[in-house]
């Protein structure tokens, strides 16, 4: 696909869980670490921007942020985070929250949402763009996929796609 759109116009992830607050992170591709401050200059969160704003940088990009400390999937764990996808309905493509084995991986940009082709992996995809070739439904949708496969209605799709209201607002 000859689209050079950013994975999303603007994304911030804020991690609040005690397990991850003290974790160290590997930032890859176009991703960067940033602080958000309130009107008084007080830092309100430690955040990550995965891709630059498409309207500021039309070349788009792909980025990933991975916890350097592996999670033992034999034990229960809780992750709590906020996602801001911006307010531009014309942006693309979305974001994936994924579990995979390497802290330096950056998957396919665009319709791969930074996790595409990473195998083995498990991803929750928040998709804001319809890619007809992937059997995407019309409108924003969420799905759970494995092994970096973002095509719907196959054996790697574990749940979804579920159409949801506007994810960008």
Language-model features: locations:
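Polar, low-complexity loop segments and adjacent catalytic/binding residues used for recognizing
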Residues: 21-169
């Amino acid at each position: 696909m000859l689209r050079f759109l950013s994975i999303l116009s603007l994304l911030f992830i804020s991690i609040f869980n005690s397990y991850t607050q003290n974790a160290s992170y590997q930032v890859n591709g176009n991703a960067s670490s940033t602080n958000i401050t309130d009107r008084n200059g007080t830092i309100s969160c430690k955040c990550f921007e995965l891709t630059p704003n498409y309207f500021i940088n039309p070349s788009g990009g792909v980025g990933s942020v991975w916890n350097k400390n592996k999670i033992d999937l034999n034990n229960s764990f809780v992750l709590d985070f906020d996602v801001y996808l911006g307010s531009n309905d014309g942006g693309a493509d979305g974001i994936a929250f994924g579990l995979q084995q390497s802290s330096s991986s950056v998957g396919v940009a665009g319709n791969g949402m930074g996790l595409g082709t990473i195998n083995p992996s498990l991803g929750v995809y928040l998709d804001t763009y319809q890619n007809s070739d992937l059997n995407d439904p019309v409108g924003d949708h969420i799905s759970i996929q494995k092994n970096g496969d973002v095509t719907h209605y196959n054996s790697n799709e574990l749940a979804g796609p579920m159409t949801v209201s506007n994810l960008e607002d």
